[in-house]
Amino acid sequence: MAEAESCRHLVLVDAPGGPQVADIVNSLAGLATCTVVSLRWGSPAEHARRVDGLRALGPVDIIERADQVVDALLAVAAGGRPIDGVLAFSEIVSYHAAVAAAALRLPANSPQATIRLRRKDLQRQALSAAGVPCPEFAVVTDEDELEAASSRLAFPVVLKPAIGVGSLCVTRAEDRYQLAEAFARASRQYRDDPRVNGASPVFVVEEVIQGDNWHADERMGTRVSVESLLDADEIHHLAVTDKLPLAPPFREVGDVMPSGLPEQRRAEILDVTTRALRALGATSGATHTELMLTSDGPVIIEVNGRIGGGVFELLRTAAAYDMARQQARIALGERLEELPLFSGYAAFVTPQPPSGDYEILSVGGREEIAAVPGVVEVIQTKSAGAVLAKEAGTNAHTFRVLAAGREPDEFFTQLKAIEDSIQLELGPAPSRGAQEPHRV
């Protein structure tokens, strides 16, 4: 390690989500000396294992809530060791880490850009004002605002939290009665979910965007995402990622990188993404922009100020590209070192169970999935006894699977083999008991 690098001090703000702990440790090796601020999460045993892995980077300070991040980082700085950069990968803590970095005058987005990247209501307002394509919307905090939105917007609509995570509480409503029911249910669910860190239940209601399939293969979805890194106000788009159709109601099933769309179509997508990032004032770090493909061109669904789920693994597998290390370099005030060069494709798959409220009676298939040709990694995320709620969003998946290949045509063969390998038996959720037993 060079002396200049060893003298730099990077603080990693950690929580579940983003790259695995072992990958984070490998990505940051030799870049700087590290202090870790880790949010207590999961069971005591799970968090202890996570902290044990993170200790390979340096000392680990534990916090109980995400809103303690700023105080924790100021305490580290007050301890006499200057901080040269702040880094976070998890959407649970990325906002608070960005606020702390700005407070310490370190490389980061402005406070205005940071809050726009977090809150969909402020984001929609900024995009609309700049003329960036996005759906018609209304901000809703109570029944009166909900009634006004119902009168102004054209149904069907989508209800989503202004501050969301993993498709939590995202619901489609065909009429004002469904919307009222969804709002009441989502408000309760949102308050109870620990991932939102006590955020107030502010919602955005927006008109459904009619997607148009730009792909030669109709099995691919009408949404894409763009993965970007920003340094010193320069935007570097790393990849366009294709997405499978969502599982009901709005749950992610799989992503494929790089996109198989023609170059001209990709250029349209990147142009709208650049306009969105400029409208939001983003200048630093990682962004994950989701877009709907329509007959009139790409439309922004949302922009997130973080690495997208599975994106680190996709870039590593398809291009041998370490996005986490590049993001850390930017956090330390350096310029982007390189852009990815793809040698094949990679797929990140999260097969979804049936929509509803269930308890998992049994789950299996890990070894069978691992044996599918091209599968690189399998992580089982749920065990028998876990309860699945229909409002939980993408987090309902029981496995995360990373696969790779040379020709994109291989992907759907892999996908079918993965889905056929999952053995899942579901029973009624203990608290509701409304669903019939279900075997997948």
Per-range role (PLM):
Residues 1-113, 117-118, 144, 382-396, ...:
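ATP-binding N-terminal substructure of ATP-dependent carboxylate-amine bond-forming enzymes
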Residues 11, 129, 328-440:
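Peripheral (often C-terminal) accessory segments that flank ATP-dependent C-N-forming ligase machineries
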Residues 134-135, 156-159, 176-219, 223, ...:
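Conserved ATP-binding module of the ATP-grasp superfamily
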Residues 103-169, 193, 202:
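A conserved helix-loop-beta module that forms one wall/lid of the active-site cleft
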Residues 207-210, 216-282, 286, 304-325, ...:
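ATP-dependent carboxylate/phosphate-activation module, predominantly the ATP-grasp catalytic core
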Residues 140, 170-175, 229-231:
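Short beta-strand-to-turn element immediately C-terminal to the catalytic PLP-Schiff-base lysine
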Residues 283-295, 435-436:
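A short glycine-rich, hydrophobically flanked beta-strand micro-motif that places a catalytic Asp/Glu
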